[in-house]
């Protein structure tokens, strides 16, 4: 992955001699010499670190601050008693402000002298058991780490038991447990990997056509359809497909070919195996602290994922670590914290580019979210390239964020906004869409997934048709980025936009992907610091993409948090997430449709996550309040998609929407609550 060019200041920092800086932080007060320190680190490394089969030989990490305690109790009894999610398998040394993971050493042979315990984390801790159990239990949080070291486990990293040095060696202690109790591995594999019926896709799903006909669109067939997986899902999803054993590829270490800015670099640790041997929803849920909340005395059931997703602990920890250890402005200072923050921010850009398949990090512009990204294209690209009589084509399914900006720029430029229709099931009428395209079409903008109905749009065909008529094409990925594997190079769109908070990241951060050609022909839309190359009182010269679109101080911390969210999703696997969420949707759809008075809204063949409905005799807001009384969070309203709902003769719907941390049991609770409301047994109003 190529990295965006760095500022002169940051390059100067990178070129400074390492001899000008101590090998460890200034706070360190080690009672041994540097040579002894290196020897100790080498000994510990040789005794304890077990690289993966593809890992290159690693340089020994530097020992941490403080004395070396007895770590046996810390790694086994301490963490087990705490019941919290340590994100490393052993004590964490801190080297030059960077954390290094050091696993516990292998057991010695029967007659060998005891091995030295691993070094203690962050200062001296004479009683490691008390430090681990009492300290972390009181804090209720896991230790944080720097962005240089990849965190591979979603809860704790499971390590296989080390091979004993001799036949008489004592048994090994169990690997660290995640948040909560870990069942026996064999039982877990049987419970989650062998019983496929729990994840079976129901059959006989009935498409419920709305009772309102609009326009000349053909009606939805009322015959039942087969429950078939969308084309973007893996074939024949099952529990076996939801598990995996291959470890994720390790991050490439920073070399001379990259523009990393850290003054003190550490070698990456060996790659550990991810602990989730199967798609264990219970273990995944333990990574999301908010799911332990109660609402009105009931366990929280978060079915409002189309509005925003909840955040895993690793994202929360990463944000905290940034503000505790890296907080600074970026690209424009000659000190250590600026170097750390700059590197973390640019690493976030690299991560986004990799996640969506962009050819370069220079294709990624950080914005506040999808709405700002679309406005950037409309008011920067559109203001330059749209003339009176030119045409913009959108669809009837769009979120207001993909309607209003085009209305505004059309009013300013005299362009014409055209809208492609949908049928009563919520499908785009592709032939009608193509009929709107012509020689004056300059831009096509369409959602990948409808936020109101869940319809998966044929974006590959939309891009192909748009380009056939010479138009630029923008795809709104706000509702697809978290559910569907994205490859922008394969898709071929000129622009692709999404929000971080929709994919388990922080709010206030999102990304605009643009091809090199599209970004080059787009002028800056805001002026200020950072985006300039040179300024005089008479004129200004601008940087190239993506810098010219990022005036002022960006949302640095939340970009760094987005990095961790995307890595979390990558560890689980987007294809596995898609298969599991589709199973949830196919399970809920026929059971909800079977409740008297329920009418499903949006019954397209290919859907993702969203299950909109109305209930006869009840306003959607009443249903939403009644469900909230049961601890169930859904959206009730027009979902910022009034044209789509009005096309179907409605002003509002109830919209549950699913994510990979939701369960079939939660769906059952939801269905029972809706049935009670329908039968008059719930307090509505």
From Swiss-Prot:
Gene3D superfamilies, per database record: Aspartate Aminotransferase, domain 1, Type I PLP-dependent aspartate aminotransferase-like (Major domain)
GO biological process, one term: cysteine metabolic process
Signal peptide: none
GO molecular function per UniProt: cysteine desulfurase activity; pyridoxal phosphate binding
Keyword annotations of the record: Cell membrane, Encapsulin nanocompartment, Membrane, Pyridoxal phosphate, Transferase
GO cellular component, as recorded: encapsulin nanocompartment; plasma membrane
EC number: 2.8.1.7
Compositional bias (Pro residues): 102-121, 164-178
Annotated region (Cargo-loading domain), positions in chain: 1-282
N6-(pyridoxal phosphate)lysine PTM positions: 502
SUPFAM superfamilies: PLP-dependent transferases
Catalysed reaction equations from the record: (sulfur carrier)-H + L-cysteine = (sulfur carrier)-SH + L-alanine
Bias-annotated ranges (Low complexity): 71-85, 122-135
Membrane as UniProt keyword: yes
Segments traversing the membrane: none
Protein's cellular compartments: Encapsulin nanocompartment; Cell membrane
Disulfide bonding pattern of the chain: none
Cofactor field: pyridoxal 5'-phosphate
Family designation: Belongs to the class-V pyridoxal-phosphate-dependent aminotransferase family. Csd subfamily.
PANTHER family: CYSTEINE DESULFURASE, CYSTEINE DESULFURASE 1, CHLOROPLASTIC
Function of the protein: Cargo protein of a type 2A encapsulin nanocompartment involved in sulfur metabolism. Cysteine desulfurases mobilize the sulfur from L-cysteine to yield L-alanine, an essential step in sulfur metabolism for biosynthesis of a variety of sulfur-containing biomolecules.
Extra remark: Cattle naturally infected with M.paratuberculosis have antisera that recognize this protein.
Subunit field text: Isolated from bacteria in a complex with encapsulin 2A (AC I3NID5), strongly suggesting it is found in a type 2A encapsulin nanocompartment. There are 1-2 copies of this protein in each encapsulin shell.
Protein's name according to its UniProt entry: Probable cysteine desulfurase
């Amino acid at each position: 992955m190529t990295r965006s060019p760095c500022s002169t200041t940051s390059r100067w920092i990178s070129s400074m001699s390492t001899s000008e800086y101590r090998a460890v932080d200034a706070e360190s007060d080690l009672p041994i010499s540097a040579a002894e320190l290196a020897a100790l680190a080498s000994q510990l490394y040789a005794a304890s670190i077990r690289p993966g089969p593809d890992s290159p030989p690693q340089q020994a990490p530097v020992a941490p601050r403080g004395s070396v305690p007895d770590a046996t109790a810390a790694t086994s009894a301490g963490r087990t008693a705490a019941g919290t999610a340590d994100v490393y398998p052993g004590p964490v040394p801190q080297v030059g402000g960077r954390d290094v993971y050091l696993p516990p050493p292998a057991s010695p042979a029967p007659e060998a002298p005891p091995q030295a315990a691993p070094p203690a984390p962050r200062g001296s801790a004479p009683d490691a058991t008390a430090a681990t159990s009492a300290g972390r239990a009181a804090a209720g949080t896991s230790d944080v780490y720097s962005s240089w070291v990849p965190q591979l486990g979603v809860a704790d990293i499971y390590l296989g038991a080390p091979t004993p040095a001799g036949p008489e060696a004592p048994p090994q202690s169990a690997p660290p447990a995640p948040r909560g109790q870990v069942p026996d591995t064999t039982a877990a594999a049987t419970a989650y990997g062998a019983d496929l019926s729990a994840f079976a896709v129901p059959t006989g799903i009935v498409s419920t056509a709305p009772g309102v006909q609009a326009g000349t669109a053909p009606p939805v067939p009322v015959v039942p359809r087969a429950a078939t997986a969308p084309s973007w899902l893996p074939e024949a999803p099952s529990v076996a497909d939801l598990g995996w054993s291959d470890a994720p590829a390790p991050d490439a270490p920073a070399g001379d070919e990259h523009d990393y800015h850290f003054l003190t670099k550490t070698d990456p640790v060996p790659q550990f195996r991810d602990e989730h041997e199967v798609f264990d929803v219970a273990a995944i849920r333990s990574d999301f602290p908010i799911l332990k909340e109660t609402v009105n005395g009931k366990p929280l059931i978060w079915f409002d994922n189309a509005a925003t997703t909840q955040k895993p602990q690793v994202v929360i920890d990463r944000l905290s670590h940034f503000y505790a250890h890296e907080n600074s402005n970026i690209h424009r200072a000659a000190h250590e914290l600026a170097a750390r923050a700059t590197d973390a921010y640019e690493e976030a850009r690299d991560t986004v580019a990799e996640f969506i398949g962009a050819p370069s990090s220079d294709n990624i512009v950080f914005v506040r979210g999808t709405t700002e990204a679309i406005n950037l294209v409309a008011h920067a690209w559109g203001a330059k390239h749209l003339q009176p009589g030119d045409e913009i084509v959108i669809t009837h399914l769009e979120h207001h964020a993909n309607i209003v900006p085009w209305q505004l720029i059309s009013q300013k430029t005299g362009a014409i906004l055209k809208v492609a229709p949908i049928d009563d099931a919520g499908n785009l009428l592709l032939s009608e869409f193509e009929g709107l395209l012509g020689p004056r079409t300059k831009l096509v903008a369409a959602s990948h997934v409808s936020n109101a109905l869940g319809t998966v749009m044929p974006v590959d065909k939309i891009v192909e048709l748009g380009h056939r008529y010479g138009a630029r094409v923008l795809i709104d990925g706000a509702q697809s980025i978290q559910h569907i594997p994205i490859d922008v190079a394969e898709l071929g769109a000129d622009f692709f936009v999404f929000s971080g908070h929709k994919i388990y990241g922080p709010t206030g951060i999102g990304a605009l992907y643009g091809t090199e050609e599209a970004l080059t022909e787009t002028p800056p839309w805001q002026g200020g610091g950072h985006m300039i190359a040179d300024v005089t009182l008479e004129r200004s010269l601008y940087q190239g993409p993506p810098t010219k679109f990022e005036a002022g101080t960006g949302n640095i911390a939340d970009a760094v948090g987005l990095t961790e969210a995307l890595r979390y999703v990558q560890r689980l696997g987007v294809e596995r997430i898609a298969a599991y969420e589709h199973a949830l949707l196919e399970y809920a759809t026929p059971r909800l449709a079977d409740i008297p008075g329920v009418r499903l809204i949006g019954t397209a063949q290919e859907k993702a996550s969203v299950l909109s409905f109305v209930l006869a005799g009840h306003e959607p807001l009443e249903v939403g309040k009644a469900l909230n009384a049961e601890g169930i969070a859904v959206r009730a309203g027009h979902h910022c998609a009034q044209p789509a709902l009005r096309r179907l003769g409605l002003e509002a719907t109830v919209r549950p929407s699913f994510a990979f941390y939701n369960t079939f049991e939660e769906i059952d609770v939801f269905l029972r609550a809706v049935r009670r409301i329908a039968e008059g047994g719930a307090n509505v109003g």
